[in-house]
Amino acid sequence: MSIENLKSALPAYAKDQKLNIGSLTRSTELNEEQLWGSLVAAAAATRNDLVLSEILEEAREHLSEEAVDAALGSATVMAMNNVAYRAKSWLGDDFAQVKFGLRMNIIAKPGVDKATFELWSTVVSAINGCEHCLSAHANTLLEEGVTKEQIWEGIKVAGVVEAVAQALQAEAVRSAE
C-alpha cells in the first residue's frame, strides 16, 4: 500500500496531511479513474521522485496503463502550458496575439474522456500556479457537466499531494544534515 508508505514517512508536524491524503483516497466525490489519475498527475507535478513512485505503485491497481499515461501526459503538457501562459500573461497585451507555436496533441487525444483529462489538467495547473490555465480548465469542466464540488475535490488532491511532497523533501534535507 503505497499511500500507507507515504503516510508512514510523514513527520509529526504533517499529521494533517497524513489524515488528508487518507481521506482523499477514500473520496466518493470523484470516480476511481478521476481520483487516482488526479493523484498521479499531482504527484508528477510535484517533481518529487518518492511521492510519484509511491502513488504510481498504488494507482496502477486502480487505473489502466492508458489512464496512467494520460495522467502523466497531463502533467507534462501542463508543465509546458502553465509556464507559457503565465509568461504571456505577465508580458501583457503586446504578447496576447503572438502565436503559441507549441505542440499539445495529447489534449485532443489523451486516452481518457475529455472531462477526466481536463480535471487532471486543472489539478496540475493549481500546483503550477497558472491562473489562466486553472480558470480555463475549470470553465471547460463546468461546461462538461462536472460539478464545482468535483472540481474542488481535484484541487484538494493538488494541495494535499503538494504538501506531502514538501514535507517529505524537508525531511530528506533534514536527515541529510
Swiss-Prot record:
* Cystine pairings recorded for this chain: C130-C133
**EC number(s) per UniProt?**
1.11.1.28
Q: Tell me which UniProt keywords the record has, alphabetically.
A: Antioxidant, Disulfide bond, Oxidoreductase, Peroxidase, Redox-active center
Looking up InterPro entries in the UniProt record yields: AhpD (IPR004674), AhpD-like (IPR029032), AhpD_core (IPR004675), CMD-like (IPR003779)
The EC class name is oxidoreductase
Q: Which Gene3D superfamilies match?
A: AhpD-like (1.20.1290.10)
Q: Which GO terms describe its molecular function?
A: alkyl hydroperoxide reductase activity; disulfide oxidoreductase activity; hydroperoxide reductase activity; peroxiredoxin activity
List the catalysed reactions. N(6)-[(R)-dihydrolipoyl]-L-lysyl-[lipoyl-carrier protein] + a hydroperoxide = N(6)-[(R)-lipoyl]-L-lysyl-[lipoyl-carrier protein] + an alcohol + H2O
| GO BP annotations, alphabetical order | cell redox homeostasis; response to oxidative stress
Q: Give the positions the UniProt entry annotates as the active site.
A: C130, C133
**Pfam families the record matches:** CMD
* Family as reported in the entry's similarity comment: Belongs to the AhpD family.
Cite the record's note on assembly.
Answer: Homotrimer.
What job does this protein perform? Answer: Antioxidant protein with alkyl hydroperoxidase activity. Required for the reduction of the AhpC active site cysteine residues and for the regeneration of the AhpC enzyme activity.
What is the name of the protein in this document? Answer: Alkyl hydroperoxide reductase AhpD
Organism lineage reads as:
Bacteria, Bacillati, Actinomycetota, Actinomycetes, Mycobacteriales
